[in-house]
Design a protein with these regions (language model features):
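Metal-dependent amide/peptide-bond hydrolase catalytic core
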Residues: 1-161
């Protein structure tokens, strides 16, 4: 979320706001709200330090501040997670659905599994396929559901053996 203008009213509950300003003046206020994705606490802290450094170098006669709120914890790759992924890959191949490779951490979002990642092996991304994720235009391709459900069920079965 990015809002800027002479007057800015931001509602954290709805992640929305209203602004007023003119195009021929410099905005008096700007509010930016977003999330950081990281695979380790070290990476998170390094990134935050760099962002603080940038914010501290604001222009003369201006002020800037930055705050961070932890949300999803880091979930770095582990041997256990890669073993679960290898099982999913084999299940997918056995079902004729093709191989499954790790998704680039730079392109993924946060995952609920991150909250228990320190305590158990797991993977994310077993859900539906579609487009427009996390937007009002989000769609789900229902034709993929049966294959994904079957693949997940077989993975769970094989993990118990």
């Amino acid at each position: 979320t990015l809002l800027g203008g002479t007057f800015v009213d931001y509602d954290k509950q709805t992640s929305s706001g209203t602004v007023f300003g003119k195009t021929n003046v410099v905005a008096q206020k700007a509010v930016v709200n977003g999330g950081l994705r990281f695979i380790s606490e070290e990476q998170k802290e390094t990134t935050r330090a760099k962002m603080r450094e940038i914010v501290a170098k604001n222009l003369p006669q201006t002020s800037a501040s930055i705050r961070f709120t932890d949300s999803y914890p880091a979930m770095g790759p582990t041997g256990g997670n890669l073993a679960v992924l290898a099982k999913l890959d084999q299940v997918s191949k056995d079902m004729g659905q093709g191989g499954v490779a790790p998704y680039d951490p730079l392109k993924r979002g946060a995952a609920d599994i991150s909250f228990v990642a320190d305590y158990t092996d797991g993977i994310d991304g077993l859900g539906t396929m579609g487009s427009g994720a996390h937007t009002p235009q989000e769609t789900v391709n229902l034709k993929t559901m049966n294959a994904l459900i079957q693949r997940s069920a077989l993975l769970i079965y094989r993990l118990t053996r």
